[in-house]
Amino acid sequence: MQKHFTLAVDADGIALITMDSPGRSMNVLGPEVEAELAAIVDRIVADAGIRGAIITSGKPSFLAGYDLTEFLRSFGPQLTPVQVYENFKGLGNLLRRIETCGKPFAAAINGLALGGGFEVCLACHYRVIADDPKAFVGLPEVKVGLLPGGGGTQRMPRLIGVTQSLPYLLEGGNIAAAEAKKLGLVHEVVPAGELIAAAKRWLMGSPVAVQPWDQKGYRVPGGVAFASAGTTQTFMGATALVARKTLHNYP
């Protein structure tokens, strides 16, 4: 029985996955949510009648990230590093499963998608966001001294390059819909009422169910020369900028 998601498949073979955790104002990630979503992904992959899927939310926001209560339960001084790794590798494995499963997934981002929520979007092959001030994306974990652990630090630079990614990875700022489109983090910005239709339009076209970085000949935008003088200067400059903005109170 599904508690956090509903799954509906229309006559065209498009699956609509709607997140709507009961008793919460926002959807958040946790082991139970991840297990449910993993089971849904497996079902979609196994069903030859399903040609693609849309992930969206039944709440005003999309997905707010990881449940900190679950996080604290899974991480503590009583656990070994290996145990901590085992507790947190599930999300990364799930998102890699989505992007390599062979069927196209589109994210219909109706509200904020932060942290793990944005990482879910980045794992989808297509991203549509609502033209709404309350719809924005980002990886804010660094603000509380954490690291985005679901692959966001890897997918963002692979989409828009190291130089453009660094300010968002180091400062954890929110990215509005129009800016996300300009950067290349989302594909479309549409009115809120057209989100699902836009995602389905892509799925009904000729969707590519392979991420750019999994395609032959892929190159990181701007180059991947982390040891180059230019990249080193970028890292140094970004670090100095963050230190100045935070009055050296960077977590």
Question: Where are the predicted features?
Answer:
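Intrinsically disordered, low-complexity segments enriched in small/flexible residues
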Residues: 31-34, 40-41, 164-166, 170, ...
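Conserved CoA-thioester-binding segment of acyl-CoA-metabolizing enzymes
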Residues: 1-56, 82, 93-96
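Hydrophobic, secondary-structure "cap" segments at the distal end of domains
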Residues: 153-163
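Glycine-rich beta-to-alpha active-site loop
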Residues: 96-144, 148
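Receiver (REC) domain switch/active-site residues of two-component response regulators
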Residues: 125, 186-187
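Glycine- (often His-adjacent) and acidic-residue-rich active-site loop
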Residues: 57-94, 113, 143-145
